[in-house]
């Protein structure tokens, strides 16, 4: 199996619920190492640049309002098949459709406030990691 890196955001509503530690425990239990992390308050410009591929979608405005409503916790995760593994533990985008025991089922409230963002491919992971992290801020362990 290939060791990969993926990108994750714990969204503002989940941050305000004080579940960062619980989510980090789930990452580590799933053998996803946290190799870099930051807490940020995204500007509208940062959020629009990050989610640029959704610019023409109906939900774009709500997404930007939600992701900039408070601090986010961003992290780089590393492990075997990290992109797929992270997507599996996150669960479906809509927390109401996510399987019990997944992060979104346990910590998400709605389609917009679904607790987390995770890269959907290796190419996305590379782009998203580079958007927020410098090379010398990431430490494999």
Curated annotation (Swiss-Prot):
Enzyme Commission number(s) from the entry = 2.7.4.6
Q: Which domain of life is it from?
A: Bacteria
Pfam families in alphabetical order: NDK
| Cofactor or coenzyme needed | Mg(2+)
Q: Which family does it belong to?
A: Belongs to the NDK family.
Matching PANTHER family: NUCLEOSIDE DIPHOSPHATE KINASE, NUCLEOSIDE DIPHOSPHATE KINASE DDB_G0292928-RELATED
Protein name in the entry: Nucleoside diphosphate kinase
């Amino acid at each position: 199996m290939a060791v990969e890196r993926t990108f994750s955001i714990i969204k503002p509503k989940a941050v305000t619920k004080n579940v960062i530690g619980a989510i980090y425990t789930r990452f580590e239990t799933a053998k996803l190492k946290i190799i870099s992390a930051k807490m940020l308050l995204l500007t509208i410009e940062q959020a629009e640049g990050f989610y640029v591929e959704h610019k023409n979608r109906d939900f774009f405005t709500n997404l930007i309002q939600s992701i900039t409503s408070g601090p986010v916790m961003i992290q780089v995760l590393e492990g075997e098949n990290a992109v797929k593994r992270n997507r599996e533990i996150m669960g479906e985008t809509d927390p109401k459709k996510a399987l019990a025991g997944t992060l979104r089922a346990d910590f998400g409230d709605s389609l917009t406030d679904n607790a987390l963002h995770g890269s959907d491919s290796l190419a996305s992971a590379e782009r998203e990691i580079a958007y927020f992290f410098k090379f010398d801020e990431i430490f494999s362990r």
